[in-house]
Amino acid sequence: MRLSMKFRFIFKVIAIVYSSFLFAQNGILNVGFDIDDTVLFSRDVFLNLPEDKRNPMDWGWINSHDDDYSQLITPTVDLIHFFHKNGHNIFFITARSKPKGKNLANFLTDKLMFPVEVNKNLFFSPRETIKGTRYTTKQRIMKRLRLDLFYGDADTDMIAALKAGVHPVRVVRHKASIISYGPNYFGNTIDKISPKNPFSMEDLNIFYSSNVGIFGESIYPIFWEGPQK
């Protein structure tokens, strides 16, 4: 019994030392990125999802077809390379579900030119439904990874970062995605103006020019030119 307790104590000390080395190195940041509409323009993956795989959503199909339909959002990729080349730790947190997640990891590895592995630097964090409303769960992983920064396009990304005590940075969603996916972006700028959604498309330019969003988040100022035909 005493021996077992001793080993548990030693293991705990080792875990604390390792955690401190990984997460508290001087000058090293832990930087997180959303995937869809942040790293990848993946609209066409979802638009090409076969009808018989839509309800429920076949995430295995989605995670297996980025190579066919997704395009890199180059300003974000340049930023990822900047952090990576300067020795900072890079993590990806997506609201996608995990089936065939290794295919997404392999795609990112090939395109970003450094190893991306599930549950090592790629994490799947699908939303949870509570009383009929779907809520983000990304803040749990952000806390566990002790992120310093999180880059994402959606309102839920900003909320998750704030809940986790992480500095949020908004990556400006391309207009083609705003039109396709109005909700979860400054409320919903393509719906009719309402108390719930008070901001118009014109209001976005005011936010963009001020480099601050509705949650007090920073706005990354280099915009993507858009998908290639």
Question: Model features per residue range: what roles?
Answer:
Residues 2, 56-58, 170, 221:
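Intrinsically disordered regions, especially transient/low-confidence alpha-helical propensity segments
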Residues 2-35, 43, 198-229:
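Non-catalytic pre-domain segments flanking phosphatase-related domains
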Residues 19-27, 52, 143-148:
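Generic structural signal for short, solvent-exposed loop/turn connectors between secondary structure elements
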Residues 25-39, 156-168:
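Internal hydrophobic scaffold segments of catalytic domains
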Residues 27-129:
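Alpha-helical substrate-recognition element adjacent to the catalytic core
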Residues 97, 101-229:
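C-terminal cap/substrate-recognition subdomain and adjoining C-terminal extension
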